[in-house]
A protein has these predicted regions:
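Structural detector of well-ordered beta-strand residues that form the stable sheet scaffold
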Residues: 37, 87, 117-119
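Substrate-binding/specificity loop regions of serine endopeptidase catalytic domains
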Residues: 91-219
Length: 219
């Protein structure tokens, strides 16, 4: 191959999918005699890494590149008259989790094709507490949610999703007691919130009807 798998993740996934049987018979892949088509995704563009405040060295890939990789594999399998099992060892914590993203819609469509089976990895986040599910009772005005951020963290992107037709607003209370009142829904565009003592800046954006799901998105 003209390139190498520097991370080793793709090689590991290929072994799980199609690895040959070991000498002692303790391991072999799901389909050890299959033919393998490999797509190596290029890293996400710098401006996207900056926008999402990704840590240096963190692996990140663009959804459109993944979709183009799937298209290539579909054409490759069709040109050889072979069925396709498309294994994606990639994941994200973003999105509505309802299959309404462009990639989600593509995978749902492919799942209905004869001779095409999308296989996705899941569960790697385990108990890392990167998701929170809550609700506000009728007799309550708000619910407190605590975010624990490491000292070395330069920043992160957080998404809050409401279940249609619910709408929410957010406010903030810093560890030193600085309080930001709830930001009204009437505000359009980005809202910049600054905590002077923590030297922290928060950007809030309301999307009251996200294009794919129709639900409210706050990020």
């Amino acid at each position: 191959m003209p390139t190498r798998d520097e991370l080793g993740h793709g090689t590991f996934m290929a072994g799980v999918a199609a690895g040959s049987e070991t000498e002692d018979g303790s391991f072999f892949g799901a389909a050890p005699r299959c033919r393998i088509g490999v797509v190596k995704c290029r890293p996400a563009k710098s401006y996207l890494r900056d926008f999402y405040l990704l840590a240096d060295g963190a692996s990140a890939y663009q959804e459109n590149d993944i979709m183009m990789g799937l298209k290539y594999l579909l054409l490759l399998a069709a040109s050889r008259g072979l069925p396709l099992v498309a294994v994606l060892g990639l994941g994200t914590s973003q999105g509505s989790h309802e299959g309404t993203s462009p990639l989600g819609k593509m995978l749902n469509q492919l799942a209905g094709f004869s001779g095409v089976i999308p296989v996705l990895a899941a569960g790697n986040e385990a108990a890392k507490s990167r998701h929170f599910l809550g609700s506000v009772a009728r007799n309550e005005e708000y619910e407190d949610v605590e975010l624990r951020v490491a000292d070395v963290e330069k920043g992160f992107v957080l998404e809050l999703w409401a279940r249609d037709p619910e709408l929410y607003t957010v406010g903030f209370l810093s560890p030193t007691g600085e309080r930001i009142s709830r930001i009204p829904l009437t505000f359009s565009g980005d809202n910049q919130v600054r905590f002077l003592l923590e030297q922290t800046e928060i950007t809030v954006n309301y999307i009251n009807a996200e294009a794919g799901s129709g639900s409210q998105l706050i990020f």
